[in-house]
């Protein structure tokens, strides 16, 4: 398959390297984040893989959808307009798969955290919190993966109703709040940890990325899946859709 990459940063270059090593896929084009993008920019592509920034992704979305080429969106930071993006995809008859993290390891981790949250829900002696660490150049805070994990925790645990990113001085966290802490440090690729605590014990579930290849490989694999899916069932997808089909 042929993929057009939008974004030539660290992730874009890693995706290009994975495609080159695959022996079965090709890079049709690489478009810089500030390039003038039109529907013709994606001619001859089987899928688009976007790793840019929020503003560029939202600005280029109409052109990507108008091209008729399915889009894999690895750009984060636009959860507040997610419903609007999904509506645009549907109206255009297009396909878009969004994930804050395409690493298969991370997505297995997220499912593990959700199951752990479900298991402790009936037992009030257990509380849960979440933290993430990334390199100092990462812009969004907390990470999209951390927010995805928080959504999993809230969905599985009726005792947690809202996310707290920072506590004002002098205010204690409430029992129905889930704290999501973020640390920016050095060149950390990404570390996500769920902490489950009681008076008797502590359970720690953690995922550490050793490099970016897992993210890039997952993006290429899901792009190939979406290119085929788009032919018969266009729509707005997530990694859960991809994993559910693979695990069926």
UniProtKB/Swiss-Prot annotation:
Pfam families associated with the record: DapB_C, DapB_N
Subcellular location: Cytoplasm
GO cellular component: cytosol
GO terms of biological process kind: diaminopimelate biosynthetic process; lysine biosynthetic process via diaminopimelate
Sorted UniProt keywords: Amino-acid biosynthesis, Cytoplasm, Diaminopimelate biosynthesis, Lysine biosynthesis, NAD, NADP, Oxidoreductase
InterPro entries for this protein: DapB_C (IPR022663), DapB_N (IPR000846), DHDPR_bac (IPR023940), NAD(P)-bd_dom_sf (IPR036291)
Catalytic function, reaction form: (S)-2,3,4,5-tetrahydrodipicolinate + NAD(+) + H2O = (2S,4S)-4-hydroxy-2,3,4,5-tetrahydrodipicolinate + NADH + H(+); (S)-2,3,4,5-tetrahydrodipicolinate + NADP(+) + H2O = (2S,4S)-4-hydroxy-2,3,4,5-tetrahydrodipicolinate + NADPH + H(+)
Residues involved in NAD(+) binding: 32, 74-76, 99-102
First-tier enzyme category under EC: oxidoreductase
Binding site for (S)-2,3,4,5-tetrahydrodipicolinate: 135, 144-145
Cited function: Catalyzes the conversion of 4-hydroxy-tetrahydrodipicolinate (HTPA) to tetrahydrodipicolinate.
Family matches, as HAMAP family: DapB
Protein name: 4-hydroxy-tetrahydrodipicolinate reductase
Source organism per UniProt: Chlorobium luteolum (strain DSM 273 / BCRC 81028 / 2530) (Pelodictyon luteolum)
Gene name, Swiss-Prot/TrEMBL: dapB
